[in-house]
């Protein structure tokens, strides 16, 4: 029995040590090939678009994004609205764009307050339904923002006339999903940064691990992060554990996964210092280490990372702060996607370089393929969402 255990452990170690990529793999060439197959998702009138999510069913992709028709970027305030776009995977064409939510919109059961409709997310609810989430935020900070959900009928290809409040569960109880309750929970654990009335988003969503639906939530202006679960009813987010240290690094916009030994690891954007990514780990998801840099990610930029696992291989995506466009700074022109069997030894599988930037991608596996959305824009801004097939 003892010998058998040793042999099994040795076999696992050898498997983890095997390279993922073949000799001579060209990550830049692989990235160029992927980008050549991308299509534009955003509608013709859209001037600014950012940070999309997607769900796939059959031969359709359902992409949610926040847009504005005024200017590039995502600083148009109350003019920010959210839509769902349906894409045919066989023809690689947009079939329809369906409005989801906008400032002060009157639904059958409630009227949204005035505010930017921001950072939409989507999940498969059941055989015939998707559920989309969106934050409605008064970005002046005068009023607490709230995250809402709205259901989409796949048979009718239409949203429900209703919209509902998402709940947040902390150690103190269950509340409307407002930033103040998220902050209060962190403050009880020693978090000392000031509270912010807006900026609470479902950021890194959604991942199925051990029968649970997990995500990383974030308050961007508040530099707050936490691992959380989505309940079976898909209407309540429950905080598992916060990771915000060191506070001077202003960690934000993280992506999380679990390593082969059971350790949780998150890669976090940093808004201070050299702005390279920091990594935090946890044995139980509740108590986390202080964020630190890792040697396999250097010269990172302050932009949203990704951390996925497809068919037993980890995919770690991060923005590189290198300059490729004359007359511009480093910007968000380079995005690296590295792969690993163990989360420790990494190889570069894709290097996306684009004069129109390559930022805030989201990757989803469906029927043996990996599809993605990504934000692009002239001069490194954000004016459109693109869609493509990674592999």
Where are these regions (language model features)?
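Beta-rich carbohydrate-recognition and catalytic domains
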Residues: 18-50, 55-113, 123-253, 257-303, ...
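Active-site pocket scaffolds in enzymes
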Residues: 359-360
């Amino acid at each position: 029995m003892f010998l058998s255990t040793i042999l099994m452990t040795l076999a696992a170690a050898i498997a983890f040590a095997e390279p993922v990529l073949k000799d001579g793999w060209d990550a830049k060439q692989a990235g160029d090939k992927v980008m050549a197959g991308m299509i534009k998702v955003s509608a013709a009138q859209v001037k600014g678009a950012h940070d999309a999510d997607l769900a796939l069913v059959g031969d359709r992709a359902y992409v949610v994004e926040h847009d504005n028709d005024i200017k590039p970027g995502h600083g148009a305030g109350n003019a920010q609205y959210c839509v769902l776009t349906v894409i045919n995977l066989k023809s690689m064409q947009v079939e329809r764009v369906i409005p989801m939510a906008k400032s002060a919109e009157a639904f059958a059961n409630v009227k949204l307050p005035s505010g930017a409709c921001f950072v939409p997310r989507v999940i498969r609810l059941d055989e015939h339904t998707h559920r989309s989430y969106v934050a409605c935020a008064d970005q002046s900070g005068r009023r607490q923002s709230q995250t809402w959900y709205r259901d989409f009928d796949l048979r009718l290809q239409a949203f429900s006339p209703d919209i509902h409040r998402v709940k947040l569960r902390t150690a103190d109880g269950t509340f409307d999903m407002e930033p103040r309750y998220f902050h209060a929970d962190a403050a009880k654990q020693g978090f000392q940064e000031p509270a912010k009335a807006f900026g609470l988003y479902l950021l890194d969503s959604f991942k199925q691990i051990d029968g649970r639906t997990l995500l990383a939530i974030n308050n961007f202006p508040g530099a707050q992060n936490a691992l959380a679960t989505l309940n079976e009813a898909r209407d309540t987010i429950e905080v598992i554990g916060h990771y915000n240290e060191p506070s001077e690094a202003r960690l934000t916009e993280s992506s999380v996964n679990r390593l082969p030994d059971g350790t949780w690891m998150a890669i976090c954007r940093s808004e201070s210092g050299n702005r390279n990514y920091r990594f935090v780990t946890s044995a139980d998801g509740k108590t986390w280490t202080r964020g630190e840099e890792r040697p396999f990610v250097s010269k990172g930029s302050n932009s949203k990372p990704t951390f996925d696992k497809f068919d037993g291989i980890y995919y770690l995506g991060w923005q590189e702060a290198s300059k490729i466009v004359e007359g511009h700074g480093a910007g968000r022109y380079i995005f690296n996607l590295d792969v690993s069997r163990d989360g420790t030894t990494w190889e570069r599988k894709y290097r996306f370089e684009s004069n129109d930037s390559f930022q805030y991608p989201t990757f989803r596996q469906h029927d043996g393929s990996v599809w993605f959305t990504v934000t692009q824009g002239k001069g490194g801004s954000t004016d459109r969402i693109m869609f493509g097939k990674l592999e």
